[in-house]
Amino acid sequence: MIFVTGDCHGNFERFKPKYFPEQAQMTKRDIVICAGDFGGVWFGDGRDEAALDWLESLPFTLAFVCGNHENYDALERYPVKDWHGGKVHRIRSHVLHLMRGQVFELEGYHFFTMGGAKSHDTEDGILEPGTPDFERKLLMLQRKPRARYRINHISWWAQEMPSEEEYAEARKNLAKVDWAVDYVITHCAPTNIALMENRHNEADPLTDFLQEVKERAHYHYWLFGHYHDNRAIDEKHILLWEQIVQVI
């Protein structure tokens, strides 16, 4: 069995048996995929350990693509392993980060993964710790009602957007399967869907790349998160948030 869900942001209540009773029939061979903003590797220290240990104790394997709210510095410290034909960061034996641009073969189906998204909650700036005016700017923003800002390497990471090497890796791996997969799992959506979701959304290099995938690739379903809703955009594109849906 394979299930997919949306953003967790470090809140894993949905995986408790009373909310996800299907797990009673699952084993570690079965997989639940989070479509970004996993948030389980957030502090990058011992504060993450209890939640990660609890996730490892669940009867299934939990995998996730990255979102725009992840601690990339901490994620990159985990070992890279090969898993079902693609690369993962192994957070725990059965808690895995599905890296960008990979094609995994799971239960006989091909899954293409491309995590990441551009943060839109930074209108008041991205503060840089260690600069002379950091404390002053932070204090001003803390006093401002509904301020939307982030702090570099504490609550925002430039790696939220893929590198050129990751785009190249994605195209290379898609070419190996003739741009034909069964499922696409991303955090944000292709440009035409992203612009439809919210008038404040803007195209960016990642949404444009995903638009290229949408137009070039052959796939059955595309599941994504990021926009905090649960609904079918059309017969092939599914936006997820709290829901956990079975795909295989």
Regions found by a protein language model. Name each.
Residues H9-R14, G39-G44, N68-E76, V103-F104, ...:
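Active-site environment of divalent metal-dependent phosphoester hydrolases
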Residues S93, E107-H200:
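Active-site-proximal loop/helix segment associated with metal-binding centers of metalloenzymes
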Residues A50-D53, N173-A175, A180-G225:
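Cap/insert and terminal regions of metallo-dependent hydrolase folds
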Residues M1-V4, C8-R14, F134, A147:
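Acidic, histidine-bearing metal-coordination/catalytic regions of metal-dependent phosphoesterases
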Residues I2-V4, I33-C34, V184, L223:
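Residue-level marker for buried hydrophobic side chains located in beta-strands
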Residues M1-F3, Q102-T113, Y183, D234-I238:
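Beta-strand-turn-beta hairpins that frame and shape the catalytic cleft
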Residues E105, D208-R216, Y227-I248:
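Binuclear metal-dependent phosphoesterase catalytic core
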Residues T5, N11-L106, R199, A203-Q211, ...:
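Core catalytic region of metal-dependent phosphoesterases/phosphodiesterases
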